[in-house]
A protein has these predicted regions:
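Asp-box/BNR beta-propeller blade signature and adjacent active/binding-site loops
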Residues: 1-178
Length: 178
């Protein structure tokens, strides 16, 4: 959940449900800052049980950010920049427990990018960036969603446009080598 004050300060918070979404309970703030705007956060649970929050930002040069909970979502560490631009982010666990992180790149050349992180998502600053597409028409792209097709193939779908044209949903099939 994202919230905003009259002064424009934003924060994101964790809400939990123990009855499949019928009722929700407030857990804790994930990230807040006096100048950085947070929104469109995705969560990922690591094999060790950490909850990793991948945060979209504004007023921070579109930097991807991360925060981590090591206590089951009762609290999160101070957010930090991941060292690259891209948003919103989406994580998918691979069969070998590595993590495919997908995101839109909303700067020239506009496109869709991925990184493969270690199982605990601790190597985000050094994981190589892989460009899936760099032919977007403008910055109105992204919202990736990766899905395992089988153990070696992933379909990454996303919102896209070419030459500032009609917006559409497109996809790229990746082959993962282990």
């Amino acid at each position: 959940m994202a919230s905003s004050t009259a002064e424009g300060i934003t924060s994101v918070h964790l809400m939990t449900s123990d009855n499949k979404g019928l009722n929700w309970n407030y857990s804790c703030p994930i990230a807040q800052d006096d100048s950085v705007i947070f929104n469109e956060t995705s969560l990922y649970e690591t094999p060790k049980g950490d909850i990793v929050a991948f945060l979209r930002t504004a007023a921070f040069d579109d930097q991807a950010c991360i925060a981590r909970s090591t206590d089951g979502g009762k609290s999160f560490s101070k957010w930090e920049s991941m060292g690259f631009q891209g948003h919103p982010l989406n994580a998918l666990r691979l069969p070998d427990n590595r993590v495919l992180l997908t995101y839109g790149y909303r700067h020239q050349p506009f496109g869709i990018r991925v990184r493969i992180l270690n199982p605990e998502c601790t190597d985000f600053a050094s994981a190589p960036e892989i460009i899936l597409r760099d032919d977007g028409g403008n910055s109105d792209i992204g919202y990736t969603w990766p899905v395992m097709m089988d153990d070696n193939h992933i379909l990454v779908t996303y919102y896209f446009n070419k030459d500032n044209g009609i917006r559409h949903i497109a996809g790229t099939i990746l082959e993962i080598k282990y």
